[in-house]
Amino acid sequence: MSQNLIRIATRKSPLAMWQAEFVKAELEKIHEGLTVELLPMSTKGDIILDTPLAKVGGKGLFVKELEVAMLEGKADIAVHSMKDVPVEFPEGLGLEVICEREDPRDAFVSNTYKTIEDLPQGAVVGTSSLRRQCQIRAARPDLVIKDLRGNVGTRLAKLDAGNYDAIILAAAGLKRLKLEERIASFISAEQSLPANGQGAVGIECRTDDARVKALLAPLEHAETRMRVTAERAMNTRLEGGCQVPIGAYAEIDGDTLSLRGLVGNPDGSQIITAASSGNKADAEKLGVALAEELLAKGAKTILDAVYANA
């Protein structure tokens, strides 16, 4: 294979294609003479659209097919939304790069209302995320939450068709797709704690591919890596997949990393929170310790019930 070629395995959704195109542009800008090709693929999570994500089951719904392509030598790298990346990687693959984070917040999208507070009693809100559901229900038990699947365009079309009064989406995805004008308001991390890794893009490759690793190295963003490492460590200790009522959000100020975590009952009846801070070099330890605190407060009971119903 040409030393001047990199092939990116990517999902076919507009957002996944944007992420792959972004990495392609960055690589070609940094490395003169490098050619980057995209290999668009469908994954299990893209194909099964009529079932709530929590019931489709399994970790890595959106990445498995991409990983097979790399292991078979059909692709060199895969670009992922960090919130979709499983905790464990198949032998021979690893997360080589985490790019600088985009806005990690959730976005409130509605054609009629400005904020969640403005929604009338009984208004219908669309989201397939158990994390968002538990936080919305805790704040507004009078709202009706309905499942919402599909890519960003499909979800917006369902809102526009009048199926929902409002929907909740990741702000980063809307910004990347140049749809920021659809955002009625941003939901602060205090109001809706983001998913671990939300807004960050990760690049996976073969662990023994020195050529590709060297080409990818300039895209690594150290601060984002530390923040996401803490968030993912917490999620891992809680044994969370990508469809769980878990929120994790880290911020860095100087050498101090502050981490907030949340586990909630999807019906909003119970939300367990914890927060801690420490040296950013101990990101992983901080994440594990915060998970232990959540477990000590009763998080396991909630998560066991969620997994039993999945």
From Swiss-Prot:
Q: EC number(s) of the enzyme?
A: 2.5.1.61
Q: Which GO terms describe its biological process?
A: protoporphyrinogen IX biosynthetic process
State which pathway it belongs to.
Answer: Porphyrin-containing compound metabolism; protoporphyrin-IX biosynthesis; coproporphyrinogen-III from 5-aminolevulinate: step 2/4
Task: Explain how, and how many, cofactor molecules are bound.
Answer: Binds 1 dipyrromethane group covalently.
| UniProt entry keywords in alphabetical sequence | Porphyrin biosynthesis, Transferase
What does UniProt give as GO cellular component? cytoplasm
- Additional record remark: The porphobilinogen subunits are added to the dipyrromethane group.
Name of the protein: Porphobilinogen deaminase
Organism lineage: Bacteria, Pseudomonadati, Pseudomonadota, Gammaproteobacteria, Alteromonadales
